[in-house]
């Protein structure tokens, strides 16, 4: 299962765990993803998206219709 936000495109980032003794081991920083259903009034249906916390705030600010229109212009299938 892909760990990518469908709205913002956020992906896992890589970095280091750093111990108290400054020993470094590689790790992944995963995005804060949640599967969420949104009701789209214009299409009269539910849309299920995998979104990050920032993606949820964008949907709150812009509205689900605007976000879906932007996703469709990028060529993403919804």
UniProtKB/Swiss-Prot annotation:
GO biological process: translation
Location of the region described as Disordered in the Swiss-Prot/TrEMBL record: 1-24
Highest taxon, organism lineage: Bacteria
Entries under InterPro entries matching the protein: Ribosomal_bL28 (IPR026569), Ribosomal_bL28/bL31-like_sf (IPR034704), Ribosomal_bL28_bact-type (IPR001383), Ribosomal_bL28_sf (IPR037147)
Protein's recorded name: Large ribosomal subunit protein bL28
Organism of derivation: Nitrosococcus oceani (strain ATCC 19707 / BCRC 17464 / JCM 30415 / NCIMB 11848 / C-107)
Keywords: Ribonucleoprotein, Ribosomal protein
Gene3D superfamilies for this protein: Ribosomal protein L28/L24
Entry GO CC: cytosolic large ribosomal subunit
Family as reported in the entry's similarity comment: Belongs to the bacterial ribosomal protein bL28 family.
A single GO molecular function term of this UniProt record: structural constituent of ribosome
């Amino acid at each position: 299962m892909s760990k990518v936000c469908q709205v913002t495109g956020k992906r896992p980032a890589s970095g280091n765990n750093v111990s108290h003794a400054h020993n470094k081991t590689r790790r992944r920083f995963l995005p804060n993803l949640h599967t969420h259903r949104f009701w789209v009034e214009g299409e009269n249906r539910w849309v299920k998206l995998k979104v990050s916390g920032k993606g949820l705030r964008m949907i709150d600010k812009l509205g689900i219709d605007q976000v879906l229109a932007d996703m469709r212009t990028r060529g993403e299938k919804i």
